[in-house]
Amino acid sequence: MTDKKLPFNKAQMEKIIEKFPTPFHIYDEKDIRHRARALRHAFSWNEGYKEYYAVKACPNPIIMSILRDEGCGMDCSSYAELMLCEAIGVVGDGITFSSNDTPAKDFEYARRLNATINLDDITHIEFLKEHGGIPETISCRFNPGGEFRIGTAIMGNPADAKYGFTREQLTEGFKQLKALGVKHFGLHSFLSSCNTDNMYYPTLAKLLFTVAKELHEEVGVEIAFINLSGGIGIPYRPEDTATDIAFVGAKVHEVYDEVFGGTDMRPRIFTELGRYMTGPAGYLVTTVIHHKDTHKHFIGTDACAANLLRPAMYGAYHHVTVLGKENAPHDHVYDITGSLCESNDRFAIDRPLPEINEGDILVIHDTGAHGFSMGYNYNGKLKSAEVLLKEDGSTQLIRRAETNKDYFATFDFLDMPRLKEER
């Protein structure tokens, strides 16, 4: 069976584990920078193009700072994510704020930072006016309804999604915003998740470019930018084909020229990729602590769904490598589990793998997006550390593991003698 490549080998990882006990997520700085540069190059034809990293994917200030240094802005959807941006010096048009069901304090904070706000609903116009005020630059999120297709393939059903303005609401919303003094408008849409079809962005782009042109003519406003949002997926399985980002950029260019050629419209293109940017650069490293043989063969690890929720929540596939046994026959079938009191706490089900022994190191791939960030504390489980594998091969702890003291910190009234014994 084809295995996925790793930026480290067993001997290197054993040295890392001496410094940072498992489980932990480790991120490959070199790969993150490479992906940011490839994306920027793919859209270099568009003057003013900018990627706004989806902070929700991996809300770590060190990872965010790496992407900031590569020219990326930040896409936020919550108060805490705005706080992270401010902490690393990303403010103003370095932030897009795309939220829904938005609390007043979030809008007010976004306005204080002068972030570019992407409105999710026509009723939010009046709400924002009352809580933060209407800026001169603003964006609106479009939901076309119906089915979203690429060719004959159905990629999603936007009509069921809770996000965005209808087409009629866009026209009315732009008119209201124009009357309130908005000078520069943006258009945004997100219609598919984890899509590896190279025609996803070009298809979405044609839809948005066409609507932008219509709005420009109907309302008489400047469409300053069009945000293709996120949605580009990654190859979770070894046999999956990765998105060809250079091809994608070239196809979006073709659509841009097709729709805007012969007009004076030259909107900037924005993207809000998260998974594509950091997903393949992250790995959950865990140690085998138990082996159980009943009706099935179970391998118990020191990690659990609290460290990586996607397999339990979505049934998502994440590739597993047994370090040091990459070339061994995959002649055993295992369920890889954690210790939560939930039967779905499994990283892999009926997975062909080499023979696994207690003490083996397992690497679970593609956890650099929606991995640590979706962690939780059910069953009293603690979130793991995060480690950066730097370009020079050294490592840096970029988030310590949670402690029981952290877990119980909100019980201000409770005296727990055991905590006094823990460091």
Language-model features, listed with the residues they occupy:
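Conserved, mostly hydrophobic/aromatic
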Residues: I32, K56, S78, A110, ...
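Short acidic, glycine/serine/threonine-rich loops at helix termini
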Residues: M64, A87-I88, F107-Y109, L128-G132, ...
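Active-site loop/helix belt of alpha/beta enzymes
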Residues: P144-H290
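Charged (often Lys/Glu-rich) extended helix/loop segments that serve as interaction or gating elements
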Residues: K251, D257, D264-R423
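Flexible loop/turn segments at secondary-structure boundaries
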Residues: P59-I62, L84, P103, E147-F148, ...
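A charged N-terminal "starter" segment
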Residues: M1-E136, K175-A179, K183, E217, ...
